[in-house]
Regions:
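Solvent-exposed soluble domains appended to multi-pass membrane proteins
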Residues: 1, 5-8, 12-207
Length: 207
């Protein structure tokens, strides 16, 4: 069987934020999956920055506790040596292994790091025909990841695939001024107008 793993950039469930109320559920598909399949909480080693270290722990099973303060293994040890990972293990049993990410390949030295962890291919934004960006203009929208993921399956019709997908559409900064006209999702429980605008932007990007 094919295996898909999706890392949702800067994701959190708004229902878990005690002070925040949203007019309707911005992530109904997530909640449906959570209700009907195995689910749980994930402890991550970073907050506010450092997505690559969450990736590293998830892909390798190694804890960031054993690395230096502020270290990014993608930019240090993986420039010197290979590292076993989910990708290398699955390759041993015949899987083709891929990464799809709609941001730059050299950010966090990902191009090198994924190669060192045993991935066969890495499709970064440089290899995509990106035409749509988030409302703040900073990041490609995530919908392109669907077609790019399907391409990884189509490229290896006689193999099972492991495709690791990294989104970017919910990445900060979150604008303090309103940038979405007539947002589908609106928030309450936030008194500061700038923070309210930021939360409104965030929950709309989650969807």
């Amino acid at each position: 069987p094919n295996i898909i793993c999706v890392l949702l950039e800067s994701f959190c469930d708004p229902d878990e934020i005690n002070f925040l109320q949203v007019n309707e559920d911005p992530i109904p598909t997530f909640h449906e999956l959570e209700k009907n399949y195995s689910s749980g909480y994930l402890n991550i080693p970073v907050v506010g920055a450092g997505t690559a270290n969450t990736e590293f722990e998830m892909l390798t099973g190694l804890s960031m506790q054993y690395f230096g303060t502020g270290e990014y293994p993608y930019k240090t040890i993986l420039k010197q040596t290979d590292c076993e990972s989910i990708a290398s293990d699955l390759s041993k049993i015949g899987y083709a292994t891929h990464v799809v990410h709609n941001n730059g390949g050299n950010f966090y030295s990902r191009t090198n790091a994924f190669s060192k962890m045993g991935f066969d291919t890495f499709t970064s934004k440089e290899l995509m025909n990106i035409t749509e960006y988030t409302p703040n203009g900073s990041w490609p929208t995530d919908d392109i990841l669907v077609s790019e993921t399907m391409k990884t399956f189509d490229a290896t019709p006689n193999q099972s695939d492991f495709t690791y997908i990294i989104t970017v559409g919910t990445h900060g900064d979150y604008p303090k001024e309103p940038v979405i006209e007539n947002p589908t999702y609106t928030v309450s429980g936030v008194e500061d107008e700038g923070m309210k605008n930021a939360w409104t932007y965030y929950v709309n990007q989650l969807n």
